[in-house]
């Protein structure tokens, strides 16, 4: 039985990308080509390419599925009426005036108390606790105040304060549905010029929404993976996407998830017969080796943190040994890791 330690790997800190490249599609792409069905290191071959070369690995009638969520400026600094400092990270917008948020303070705020945010620009009222989150009531539409006064919530491994460049580059070019507190980073590599080439090659694309939560950065704290409680995220799958999947299957194309968030939404909405059910809801799907994929044939994804649930997910798709070999190669070849880093193209291993 695999344990948490099986998903550890050595990563030199200097390989953690601290800023995005000026040209989105100029990132590197590690293509993990499968030579044999077995999950062994010699059953795959590593091919080093530029991300813009991904067109060479896609076929007419393949369907790329993107997550169109938009990152909101979810981080606030402020104070209590007593003067004590606080930090707020919005996790989810519940309705027009209500959010769930993490609140860091020297003393836990109580229900009914007031928190002053953004140098006193406005105040929120603390509501009931929901698991580890606080309900916060905003005096005006929450998304308006978040956009006006919040700060972009860069991941904890990026060490600089967010600036105007990050506000552009930590968003996909197709982001349109505000609600995420982390970017669906595989999509950061796509630009309009690459989309034009994909169109010319007959590659189709479709969109879903999954609002990425801060839980994506939470570490797994149990060696026994079955004891891990996965965070929950809201997603929506449209009838148009469900039809696009049916059309793709009818034409013999592949369903390729752009990013682990797209994959998690697709597999959450997938039916036993391999079709996709339109609808929306919360998902806490936890994909580990042994999972049987219902829908996704391939995945475009960035490189993930050691011992993370996302490293377990890609291992389930491509094979534990294949991913170990790929990550060794990536470290040796000095690929850039994590949100602002490079990407890989993985195909589903036989039987997964």
From Swiss-Prot:
Main location, first listed in the record: cytoplasm
GO biological process per UniProt: queuosine biosynthetic process; tRNA wobble guanine modification
Keyword Aminoacyl-tRNA synthetase found: no
Cell location: Cytoplasm
Coiled-coil annotated residue ranges, if any: none
SUPFAM superfamilies associated with the record: QueA-like
Span of the signal peptide: none
Name recorded for this polypeptide: S-adenosylmethionine:tRNA ribosyltransferase-isomerase
Gene name of this polypeptide: queA
């Amino acid at each position: 039985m695999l344990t948490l330690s099986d998903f550890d790997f050595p990563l030199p800190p200097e390989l953690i990308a601290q800023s995005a490249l000026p040209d989105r599609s100029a990132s590197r792409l590690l293509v993990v080509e499968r030579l044999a069905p077995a999950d062994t290191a010699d059953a795959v071959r590593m091919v080093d390419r530029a991300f813009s070369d991904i067109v060479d690995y896609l076929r007419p009638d393949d369907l790329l599925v993107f997550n169109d969520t938009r990152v909101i400026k979810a981080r606030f600094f402020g104070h209590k009426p007593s003067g004590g400092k606080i930090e707020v990270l919005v996790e989810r917008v519940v309705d027009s005036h209500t959010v769930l948020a993490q609140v860091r303070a020297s003393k836990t705020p109580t229900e009914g108390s007031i928190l002053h945010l953004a140098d006193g620009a406005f105040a929120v009222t603390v509501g009931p606790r929901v698991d580890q989150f606080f309900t916060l009531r905003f005096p005006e539409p929450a998304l308006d105040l978040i956009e006006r006064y919040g700060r972009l919530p860069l991941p904890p491994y990026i060490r600089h304060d967010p600036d105007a460049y990050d506000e552009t580059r930590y968003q996909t070019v197709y982001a349109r549905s505000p609600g995420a507190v982390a970017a669906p980073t595989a999509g950061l590599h796509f630009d309009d010029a690459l989309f034009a080439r994909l169109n010319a090659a007959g590659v189709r694309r479709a969109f879903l929404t999954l609002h990425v939560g801060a839980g994506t950065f939470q570490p797994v704290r149990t060696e026994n993976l079955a004891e891990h409680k996965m965070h929950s995220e809201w997603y929506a799958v449209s009838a148009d996407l469900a039809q696009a999947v049916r059309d793709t299957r009818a034409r013999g194309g592949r369903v390729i998830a752009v990013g682990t968030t797209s994959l998690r939404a697709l597999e959450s909405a997938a039916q036993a017969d391999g079709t996709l059910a339109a609808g929306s809801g919360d998902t806490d799907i936890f994909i580990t080796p042994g999972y049987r994929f219902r829908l996704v044939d391939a995945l475009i994804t960035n490189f993930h943190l050691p011992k993370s649930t996302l490293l377990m997910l890609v291992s389930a798709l491509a094979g534990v040994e294949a991913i170990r070999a790929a990550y060794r190669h990536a470290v040796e070849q000095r690929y850039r890791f994590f949100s602002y880093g490079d990407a890989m193209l993985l195909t589903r291993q036989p039987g997964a």
